Amino acid sequence: MPNAPEVNSVWDELLWRGLVCVSTDQGALKELLDGPPIRFYCGFDPTAPSLHVGNLAQILIMRRLQLAGHRPIALVGGSTGLIGDPRPGGERQLHSHEQVQEWVRALQQQLSRFLDFKGAAAAVLVNNLDWTKSLTALDFLRELGKHFRVNAMLKKDAVAARLSSTEGISYTEFSYQILQSLDFRQLYLDYKCVLQIGGSDQWGNITSGVDLIRKTEGAGVHAFGSPLLTASDGSKFGKTEGNAIWLDADLTSPWSFYQFFLNSDDADIPRLLRVFTFFTRSEIEDLNRSVRENASARLAHRHLAYSVTRLVHGADVADQVLLACSVLFGDGGALGKTQTGLPRIDSDTLNDSSGVTTIKAQDNTYTPYSPEGVRFAGTFPVDPRFLRSILFELPNATVSAHDLITHILQKVGLCRSLSEARRLISQGGIYVNNIKVTCPDALLDSFLDNSMPIRAAILRKGKKHLAAVFY
C-alpha cells in the first residue's frame, strides 16, 4: 500500500494531525491560513513555575503555523494568572503578585526556546498585565462589562459546571472570561491579531473574545480549539502517578521525560506522533505500520520519545538519555537495533573522572528519523554524571553486598515474592549490571565492581524494568 501524499495546506495539515476539534467558520479559516501571513496568538497562564506537556501541544501548533509563515504572539497571563480560570474541580488558590510574576518570567523563557524571534515570521512575547494594570474598576464595568450578557456567560461550560456544584463560583473567577476577551481585543488593536488558538476547554473564553471584537471594533476574527489530550484509558494525558510531566528539567528530569513517552500505550502512539513530532505523514504511517506488524520492537515509541526529548531538552541531552538507555538496558534496544560490545556497568561507567565510557555504534549513519531506528555513527561518550543521576530516580534500596539477589528483587519491588524472583532467574529474565543471573542462590557481591566510586548496582527485570541498589 503506497504512502498517502504529503499535506501541502497548513490548515489541512492541522486537520490531518487531529489538532482542530472546534472552530469558527472552517472555510474562512482555511482561506486565512493558506493565504498571506497573519498574526495569531495563544495564551498561557502562570499557574506553576513551568509549562507541561499539555502546553507543549499548543506550542507546537504555534510552531507549525510559524513554519507556514504566520507570526505568533505568545501571551503569558500576568493578570489572568492572578485571577484563575474557573475549573470544574473548584476554586483555584490565589498566588501572590510576586510569585505570579516570577512564574511569568519562567514561562516566557521556556516559550522563547520553541519559537523563532527573528525573520519575517518573528514571534512576539507579551504579558497581559501590561494593559490591565492601569484598568480601573469603573473602566472595567463601563468599557467592557456592558458588552457581556450574564445569561450567555452562565452558559459557558466551565461556569455551568461550577454553578451546579455545592461550592458555586466566585465573582473573581466568573469575570475571567472578560479579561481573556480583553486580551484578544488588545492584540487585535496593537498587532492586528486575527486568530486565537487554544485548548477546547477554553472555547467559551475564546469565543467571548471573538464576540467582543465584533461588538466593539466591527471586525470579524477567527479561532480554533484543539482537543484535550487523554490517554487511551481515558486518563488525562501528561500525568504520571498524579504528577504533571513538566518541560523544566529540574521538575521532570530528561530521563523521566523520555521514559514517559517511551512507555506510551500502543493505542496512543499514532495520535502522539501526529501531535508531538514534525515527522512527515509518510514517516508517521511507516511508524504506525511498525506498531501493527512488530509491536514488541517499540520502534515508534522510541522515535516518539527521542524526538520529543530532543525538542524540549536539546540534542545533546536527548543523545545522553538514549545512550544511557543503551547502557542501563544492556542490549542497545534504546537505539532500535541490537548492538554488540555494550559495556558492563562497572567503575568506568560510573566514574566521576574526566574519562568517559563510550559506546561504539555499528551503524554508519545518524538521523533523528529512519525506518530502522534512531542511529548513531562512530563512538559516543556517555556522561557518567548523567548515569549516576538516573540511579537516584529509579526505584532503589540500600542493601548488603552479601544479600541474596532474590531478596533484593523483592525489596526493590521488581518481584512481589521470593518465589517469583526465583522463577524469573530460572527463566533468564534477571540481570545485575547487565550480567544475566543464572543461579537463584546468587549473592549481590558476585556481580559487583568494588572499585566503583559509588557503591551501587543496577538490577533489570526483562527488557525495561530497572531498579538501583546501594550497598
Swiss-Prot record:
Keyword match Mitochondrion: no
EC number: 6.1.1.1
Binding of L-tyrosine, residues: 41, 176, 180
Sequence positions that bind ATP: 239
Keywords from the UniProt entry: Aminoacyl-tRNA synthetase, ATP-binding, Cytoplasm, Ligase, Nucleotide-binding, Protein biosynthesis, RNA-binding
Residue interval(s) of motif 'KMSKS' region: 236-240
Keyword Magnesium: no
Main localization of the protein described in the UniProt heading: cytoplasm
SUPFAM superfamilies: Alpha-L RNA-binding motif (SSF55174), Nucleotidylyl transferase (SSF52374)
Motif 'HIGH' region mapped to chain: 46-55
One Gene Ontology CC term in the entry: cytosol
Catalytic activity: tRNA(Tyr) + L-tyrosine + ATP = L-tyrosyl-tRNA(Tyr) + AMP + diphosphate + H(+)
Places the protein is found: Cytoplasm
PROSITE patterns for the chain: AA_TRNA_LIGASE_I, S4
Top EC class for this record: ligase
An example Gene Ontology biological process: tyrosyl-tRNA aminoacylation
Residues in S4 RNA-binding domain copies: 403-471
A single GO molecular function term of this UniProt record: ATP binding
Function description: Catalyzes the attachment of tyrosine to tRNA(Tyr) in a two-step reaction: tyrosine is first activated by ATP to form Tyr-AMP and then transferred to the acceptor end of tRNA(Tyr).
Family (UniProt): Belongs to the class-I aminoacyl-tRNA synthetase family. TyrS type 1 subfamily.
Description of how the protein assembles with itself and partners: Homodimer.
HAMAP family on file: Tyr_tRNA_synth_type1
Record protein name field: Tyrosine--tRNA ligase
Organism: Tropheryma whipplei (strain Twist)
Gene symbol of the encoding locus: tyrS
